């Protein structure tokens, strides 16, 4: 019989004993996700992250997370015109338990896009790269469909190639004009009611009647250097201290404060 050490007994544990299961949620913390001040609903949800441990800082794990929220939830409005628009918000900074986000893009839901595509009409799309006044480079996509004239007896409403080109040119002109003259906050305020698409629909009536004109997607291609003061201003927290002026104290001429013996 071979004489030797029993490795299982020497470690002080029984063979086959299960390891104690620790709930991973006990090591995590909840943070509130805050939307910028352009939206009616500021508190859009909560997010989880592992607690700060050693060199791993919790706030660094939260930065650059992207949250996709329906416009109906952001505006606290169940209007059908808002429910199919999705806004992407990116976490840029953490203040206490609040995650401050900024605009990162916009999109339409897939079911809305598919419901608009029908037979007997022409689909017209355009996209353009434009820069805002505060240095954001955006790629804006627009979509529209030809509309049948009320007086027409024809089943179809196809636009000619020259008309499609003219409409696409008009789309690019209006998007460029509206975005280049605005900063990011003003652009988002224009996207909320989709005023750019309404301007395009109105301007193209002379070329060919359109309907279902929407800004289909907005991508943020480039951003300026991050500045915390601008982000706080976007969230309405950028003001300094109190605006009240200090009270004036009258002192006699030649007044000197008393010398303190101990400090």
Swiss-Prot record:
Cytoplasm is among the record's keywords: yes
Residue segments, region Disordered: 236-263
Comp. bias (Basic and acidic residues): 236-254
GO BP terms: translation
Any one of the GO CC terms: cytosolic small ribosomal subunit
Superkingdom of this protein's organism: Eukaryota
Main location: cytoplasm
Gene Ontology terms for molecular function: structural constituent of ribosome
Assembly and binders: Component of the small ribosomal subunit. Mature ribosomes consist of a small (40S) and a large (60S) subunit. The 40S subunit contains about 33 different proteins and 1 molecule of RNA (18S). The 60S subunit contains about 49 different proteins and 3 molecules of RNA (28S, 5.8S and 5S).
Listed name of the protein: Small ribosomal subunit protein eS1
Organism this protein belongs to: Periplaneta americana (American cockroach)
């Amino acid at each position: 019989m071979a004489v030797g050490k029993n490795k299982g007994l020497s470690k002080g544990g029984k063979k086959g004993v299960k390891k104690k299961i620790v709930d991973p949620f006990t090591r995590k913390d909840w943070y509130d996700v805050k939307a910028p001040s352009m939206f009616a609903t500021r508190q859009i949800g909560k997010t989880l992250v592992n607690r700060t441990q050693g060199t791993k800082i919790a706030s660094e794990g939260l930065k650059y997370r992207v949250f996709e929220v329906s416009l109906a939830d952001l505006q606290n409005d169940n209007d059908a015109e808002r429910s199919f628009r999705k806004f992407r918000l990116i976490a840029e900074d953490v203040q206490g338990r609040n995650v401050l986000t900024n605009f990162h893009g916009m999109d339409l839901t897939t079911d809305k896009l598919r419901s608009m595509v029908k037979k007997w009409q022409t689909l017209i799309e355009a996209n353009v790269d434009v820069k805002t006044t505060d240095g954001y480079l955006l790629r804006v996509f627009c979509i529209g469909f030809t509309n049948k004239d009320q007086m027409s007896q024809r089943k179809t409403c196809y636009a000619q190639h020259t008309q499609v080109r003219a409409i696409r040119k008009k789309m690019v002109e209006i998007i460029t004009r509206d975005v280049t003259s605005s900063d990011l906050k003003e652009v988002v305020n224009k996207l909320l009611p989709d005023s750019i698409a309404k301007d395009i629909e109105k301007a193209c009536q002379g070329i060919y009647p359109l309907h279902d004109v929407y800004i289909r997607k907005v991508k943020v291609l480039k951003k300026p250097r991050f500045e915390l003061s601008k982000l706080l201003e976007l969230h309405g927290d950028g003001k300094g201290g109190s605006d009240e002026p200090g009270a004036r104290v009258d002192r006699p001429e030649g007044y000197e404060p008393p010398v303190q013996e101990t400090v």
